[in-house]
Amino acid sequence: MPLLPGAEPFRHDGGEVGVLVCHGFTGSPQSVRPWAGHLAERGLTVSLPLLPGHGTRWQDMQLTGWQDWYAEVDRALGELRERCSEVFVCGLSMGGALALRLAARHGDAVKGVVVVNPANKVHGLGAKALPVVRHLIPSRRGIASDIAKPGGEELGYDRVPLHAAHSFRRFLRMLDGELPQVTQPLLLMHSPEDHVVPPVDSARILARVSSRDVTERLLERSYHVATLDHDAELIFEETFAFISRLSAGVGEAGAASRG
């Protein structure tokens, strides 16, 4: 199937500091493209992959699972590590969960983690019944475009494929057990009013990780897709400030320096 316009992956070759940006479940790179673009404009090397099964039609996602989504971000991380001296991982929603697993699995190869409204549990969708219901009903109503800003719209599926939702639930349960392995500096930004991932997920993540350098920011004016909402600029600036604080490869003037 052809890609939906706007769902294309994004790559920018900048300096020696790399950033991997991960989009969310049933979404597309469009939801985090301004975030990635801001970091690219500041001179960083940025990779924003399209997750398998996304960006076309929801039926294509039925044929994929968490192993496919994680393999893609793991591959993208590997490419950044070959190109850059330092790499940060970022993500929205499920993308945040994928970023946290990359941090847990790759240790010092990941310099820091930035997550926005990260998922820790599948809520609703009859989550506990998914193992059975997914064989009876292929999909249910979508979760895209939870945005407070008038006119804000996320490019995502209008249906949630239940086989994929079941796989996502299994992934989050596994990740919860791995969160203590996350030791890197962490910037977690979340919306008090989120109709997809409730704030309790962020609280759980903060309680489970082993990171000592932790910064929490509230996104008071935004819903779930905060990267397209009123607090988008705050997210972009906080992310760059976090990376600048931790990386010797980012110059004071804002441009990422190259060796």
Give the role of each language-model region.
Residues 2-57:
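Short, surface-exposed "cap/lid" segments of acyl-processing enzymes
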Residues 221-259:
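Catalytic active-site module of serine/aspartate enzymes centered on a nucleophile-bearing elbow/loop
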Residues 57-84, 88:
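Catalytic nucleophile-loop/oxyanion-hole region of alpha/beta-hydrolase
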Residues 91-95, 99:
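Gly/Ala-rich beta-loop-alpha elbow adjacent to hydrolase catalytic centers
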Residues 35, 184, 198-207:
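Short alpha-helix in the alpha/beta-hydrolase fold that links the catalytic acid
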Residues 182, 188-190, 194:
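Short beta-strand/loop motif that positions the catalytic acidic residue
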Residues 114-124:
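Active-site nucleophile loop of the alpha/beta-hydrolase fold
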Residues 47, 203, 207-225:
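Catalytic histidine neighborhood in serine/cysteine hydrolases
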